[in-house]
Amino acid sequence: MYRFVTSNRHKFEEVSEMAALYGIEIEWVRMKYEEIQDDSTERISYDSCNKLSRIVEAPYFVDDSGLFINALRGFPGPYSNYVSSTIGNEGILKIMDDVDDRTAYFLTVVSMNEGHSITQFIGKVMGKIARSIRGSNGFGYDPIFIPEGSDRTFAEMDIKAKNAISHRSIAFRGLFEYIKMNQTAKK
């Protein structure tokens, strides 16, 4: 049984649906944990995974995600959670009000501790910031992020459509394919 350590119910639901497609059952370890403040999403995810080894039985995984807005030099980036909880989507839109370059990307880094090592999986999706909040599905920045090739925000998509293209789904597909490959190799 693989454990997903997160306090975010929405994340767990998204990831559970993806895991089921691979025939992988995951357990939710609902837990808040302290993250280091760092400019690297990869380091934040790795450090969290490493620290949790003292209290969570392997195998388990964590993820860290960020929204990186090009015109704002990557802000909010690895500080996305804090920015979301303080100024929210309205604040981001206000900062972006007179900005023409609305290109951005979402990045997710999944770190899995197998007991002997930590392996990372990265997912990235390019897109742009909408001019208004749109949609009611998803969470976080979903109502203001329009993925490349779409005219809808993530929040305007159902979970299946979002999971087909999102940064989180790319990273977690990498994880689940890795798990399946290792399960096959052990047989």
From Swiss-Prot:
Which amino acids does the record list as binding Mg(2+)? E35, D64
Named from the GO MF annotations, one term is: dITP diphosphatase activity
Quickly give the catalysed reaction: XTP + H2O = XMP + diphosphate + H(+); dITP + H2O = dIMP + diphosphate + H(+); ITP + H2O = IMP + diphosphate + H(+)
Entries under CDD domains matching the protein: HAM1
Cellular component, GO, one term: cytoplasm
Q: Cite the cofactor comment.
A: Binds 1 Mg(2+) ion per subunit.
- Matches recorded under InterPro entries: dITP/XTP_pyrophosphatase (IPR020922), ITPase-like_fam (IPR029001), RdgB/HAM1 (IPR002637)
* Active site annotation, chain numbering: D64 (proton acceptor)
Family label = Belongs to the HAM1 NTPase family.
HAMAP family, sorted: Non_canon_purine_NTPase
Q: What does this protein do?
A: Pyrophosphatase that catalyzes the hydrolysis of nucleoside triphosphates to their monophosphate derivatives, with a high preference for the non-canonical purine nucleotides XTP (xanthosine triphosphate), dITP (deoxyinosine triphosphate) and ITP. Seems to function as a house-cleaning enzyme that removes non-canonical purine nucleotides from the nucleotide pool, thus preventing their incorporation into DNA/RNA and avoiding chromosomal lesions.
Question: What is the name listed in the Swiss-Prot or TrEMBL entry for this protein?
Answer: dITP/XTP pyrophosphatase
User: Which taxonomic lineage is given here?
Assistant: Archaea, Methanobacteriati, Thermoplasmatota, Thermoplasmata, Thermoplasmatales
